[in-house]
């Protein structure tokens, strides 16, 4: 049964590409013509060009003064067999000033049959003969995984983690309430912790949360930790730390406090800027897109993980290989240049095992993200992106608004990050750069020879470095227009077929019509056009895609946890989002998450915003399914908000503050303080501000441990009554007609 994938072929129509291999063997009697040969002996090389191929141009090396060159160089092209693919072959002569074409011919690739290898002679100028060898193969496997199911590594992790969770639940809840739990039972609840965005405020708040969860034993019962923007920065710092989990958050948080106490402008010394620019130029010249997000990523990395800038997302596998820690999940959005993020956004999820988009069922190993793809096959592989680059992408709202981060004054600043973002147009974030342009420093016909090109590249690099330096120092339109700040990577879905777009969930019937009507499905939470185009597909013709901070649509990473395949029973979410004041209702982001879930047919408890009117501001709120027997797959949500309530009077749960110093330390507002020490744009935290925010969220979490424990007990009882939480029959799978008949029969066995 493990080999059957019930979701394969549901979203992306799986099609096969062709690998076309060309070997340029040799040429004889290369000539420039009678008069040309009298002046100079040819220095020949060959250019290959297929306009329909994504990596369209290749060339051999050149030989000096050789009329009978032997190259024996082999090149590969990935092709769409449904297109009219034609190979253009050009014989070139390398010159000091300008290379010269000695002739061009074409070859229809359709004349080669799949599996066939053959040599073909070509004639140039009636006397020159060139021999090429062709091989056409069907790419029967791809570098993308097409599926809605979890990858094998995550399934293996879940089984390993299940043993840890059982032990954690027994320690936390006692033997009586966990006596029936065992590794083979299906009544072990899946628990997830969520952290919102909110800059360093979210990162520091989440550090206090994680310390409380770690030391209380709750973290031992958790299967997933999902973060967005600022929370991902803490998760990155924690999971990339060499001593975690042997060293707990308490010690690691002290290091973090020291790191964020310095002014971020100290990272812009000439020596460091030079190092940043050199790294960015190296990336750009290799053919990868570079935007201001890359610069911000280096700044955030130098601040938070400066001693491990070479760490990568895949390195976190060692922290979870035996289920010893919860699986960390990170997120960003794929957005379109001409559409608001609230209207259209695809959620991209990152784990140490895979990166992909569940909406389309397309996933890849972390070391493939950023590489060039065509029809699911890697056509140009790059090194895995460093973790700090991903941190910059996950929190890229701050690279978009970096003038606020660095304290550069402008004439048009909103008072909050939300106001700033509302003033942004997609074209301001993404700029006018065409996502279909190639970044490689290619040599079109007639370019200068290698020495002349080296000089050109040096001048080009110097000019580019100068522009980026000017941008960093603030004397640039980048700071005023915010253009070109979104992250950008090669489109890993280039060339795929998306004939039909489906909702996020492959399951039907998860929400009853009655509940949909009761929930006022179409009611606007933040904007009349919110989520209007979420069913629209990605543009599979664009060579690059823009990726931005997920907080630009809503500020909680629920889409990662609500995937039906993860079957999460209990969600403990921590919202550090900005509010107009400390007394403002704290449910905006949660309501957006609820609406998104309903629109994607995912079970979610009814969020009643009027609970704030009835009960006032609290440290946490609980939302459960109204009718568990009907909403049988609906998780329970414990929603913590950023509020300084009992912390003012208690230094630990049940331990009153006594001294004036203790009371003064806890007497602070978060959003009402006119000095705005906890602003979303504050990237420098003195030790006292750090401790206040850290200790507040640690206290709030510990103060509600009994609420969490009770929800765990209820989740265990619920699992006993409904053990097959994520059981799926073939009749529940939308678009099951796309499944092959043999797959259907195997799945139904």
Swiss-Prot record:
Record's catalysed reaction(s): a 1,2-diacyl-sn-glycero-3-phosphocholine + H2O = a 1-acyl-sn-glycero-3-phosphocholine + a fatty acid + H(+); a 1-acyl-sn-glycero-3-phosphocholine + H2O = sn-glycerol 3-phosphocholine + a fatty acid + H(+)
One GO MF term attached to the UniProt entry: phospholipase A2 activity
Assigned GO CC terms: cytoplasmic vesicle
EC number: 3.1.1.4, 3.1.1.5
Keyword line: Calcium, Cytoplasm, Cytoplasmic vesicle, Hydrolase, Lipid degradation, Lipid metabolism, Metal-binding
Domain PLA2c: 138-740
Subcellular location: Cytoplasm; Cytoplasmic vesicle
InterPro entries: Acyl_Trfase/lysoPLipase (IPR016035), C2_cPLA2 (IPR041847), C2_dom (IPR000008), C2_domain_sf (IPR035892), LysoPLipase_cat_dom (IPR002642)
Domain of life assignment: Eukaryota
Active site: 229, 549
Biased composition, class Basic and acidic residues, residue ranges: 442-457
One GO term of the biological process aspect: phospholipid catabolic process
Ranges for region Phospholipid binding: 1-178
A Pfam family of this chain: C2
Residue span of region Disordered: 417-458
Residue intervals of the C2 domain: 1-124
Enzyme class: hydrolase
Activity control note: Stimulated by agonists such as ATP, EGF, thrombin and bradykinin as well as by cytosolic Ca(2+).
Cited function: Selectively hydrolyzes arachidonyl phospholipids in the sn-2 position releasing arachidonic acid. Together with its lysophospholipid activity, it is implicated in the initiation of the inflammatory response.
Cross-referenced PANTHER family: CYTOSOLIC PHOSPHOLIPASE A2 (PTHR10728:SF13)
UniProt protein name: Cytosolic phospholipase A2
Source species of the chain: Xenopus tropicalis
Gene that encodes it: pla2g4a
